[in-house]
Amino acid sequence: MLTKRIIPCLDVKDDVVVKGVKFRNHRIIGDIIELAQKYSDAGADELVFYDIGASPDNKLLSIKWIQEIAKKINIPFCVAGGIKSVENARAILNEGADKISVNSAALARPDLIDELVYEFGSQCVVVGIDSKFIDGEFKVCQYTGSADKTVQTLLDPVSWAKEVESRGAGEIVLNCMNQDGVKGGYDLEHLREVQSNVSIPVIASGGAGEIQHFIDVFKYTEIDGALAASVFHDDIIAIPELKQELFKNNIPTRIVK
C-alpha cells in the first residue's frame, strides 16, 4: 500500500513566503529557504511552492531560489506559477525542481498539458484545479493569486479533472477555495466527487486546521496526499506528531526517526 503524503505548501510572493485566507489578504510568513529546510527536516514528504503573483501579473516566477532549495533538501518539490510553455518548465526543472504544476495557463491553453507531458513525462506534470462553490455549484477559477484578477470559468471541476487526466497529467491538486485558510476541515464530499472520476493521484488542498482533519481526509476519501499551509506555518501542527497520529489510525505514512 502506498503511503499517504503530507505536503506543506509555501505560497511565494516577491520572493518571500506568504499566506492568505480564501486566497486573499496575504501576510508575510518568512524566508523561502529556511521554511523549506524546516519542513524537510520535520519529515514532510514533499513541498509545493506556488508563486501566487506570477500568473495574475503575467510573469514567470522567480527561479533564483529553486537551485538553492534543491541543494538544501532531500525530498521532492514541485514549483508552480506563471508556467506557460515547455521552455518555462524546463528552466525550473533544470534548476532542480522535481515537478512543475500548471493551472491558469492550462485553462487558457489546454494543449500545454500535452506538450509538457510529451517533453518531460507524466510524473513531472501536476495540474492545480482551483474549485469554488458559487451559486449552488462548483466552478473552476483562474488567476486566483490576485483578488481583482480572479476569473470564474464555465468549467466544472469533475469535467476539467477528466480532461486533465486524458491529456496525460500525472497528478491533480484540488484546491477547495471556500475552505482555504479557514481551518474548518477539508471538503470531503467534493474531494470524493473529483477523485472518484479519475485514476491519477489527487492531492487535497484547503481546510486543514487540526490533526483530525488529516485523519478524516485519509479515512473517508481515496486521495493520495494532503496539502496544508497555515497549520504548519503557525506551528499549530508539528509534522512528526501528525505522522504519529496517522500511524496510530492505521493510515500508511512515512515515519522519520
UniProtKB/Swiss-Prot annotation:
Location in the cell: Cytoplasm
Cellular component terms (Gene Ontology): cytoplasm
Entry annotated with the keyword Lyase: yes
InterPro entries: Aldolase_TIM, His_biosynth, HisF, IGPS_HisA/HisF, RibuloseP-bd_barrel
Catalytic activity: 5-[(5-phospho-1-deoxy-D-ribulos-1-ylimino)methylamino]-1-(5-phospho-beta-D-ribosyl)imidazole-4-carboxamide + L-glutamine = D-erythro-1-(imidazol-4-yl)glycerol 3-phosphate + 5-amino-1-(5-phospho-beta-D-ribosyl)imidazole-4-carboxamide + L-glutamate + H(+)
Catalytic site: 11, 130
Keywords: Amino-acid biosynthesis, Cytoplasm, Histidine biosynthesis, Lyase
CDD domains per the UniProt record, alphabetical: HisF
Pathway: Amino-acid biosynthesis; L-histidine biosynthesis; L-histidine from 5-phospho-alpha-D-ribose 1-diphosphate: step 5/9
Enzyme class: lyase
Protein EC: 4.3.2.10
Keyword Transmembrane helix found: no
Main location: cytoplasm
One Pfam family in the UniProt entry: His_biosynth
Quaternary context: Heterodimer of HisH and HisF.
Xref: NCBIfam families: hisF
Family of this protein: Belongs to the HisA/HisF family.
Protein name: Imidazole glycerol phosphate synthase subunit HisF
Organism: Francisella philomiragia subsp. philomiragia (strain ATCC 25017 / CCUG 19701 / FSC 153 / O#319-036)
